[in-house]
């Protein structure tokens, strides 16, 4: 999992990326290509 300041650019890398908020943290998840997983930090 990548940790990035800005998730907007990471979200645009694949069309199946989803922006999810869990426990006060923002994540990018992708059910199809799981290597696009990222967390904001």
Curated annotation (Swiss-Prot):
Entry-linked InterPro entries: Ribosomal_bL36, Ribosomal_bL36_sp, Ribosomal_L36_bact
Keyword Ribonucleoprotein in annotation: yes
Pfam families cross-referenced by the UniProt entry: Ribosomal_L36
One of the GO biological process terms: translation
A GO-annotated cellular component: ribonucleoprotein complex
HAMAP family for the chain: Ribosomal_bL36
Name assigned to this protein: Large ribosomal subunit protein bL36
Protein species of origin: Rhodopseudomonas palustris (strain BisB18)
């Amino acid at each position: 999992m990548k940790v990035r300041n800005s998730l907007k650019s990471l979200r645009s890398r694949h069309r199946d990326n989803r922006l999810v908020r869990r426990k006060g943290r923002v994540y990018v998840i992708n059910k199809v290509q799981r290597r696009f997983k990222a967390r904001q930090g």
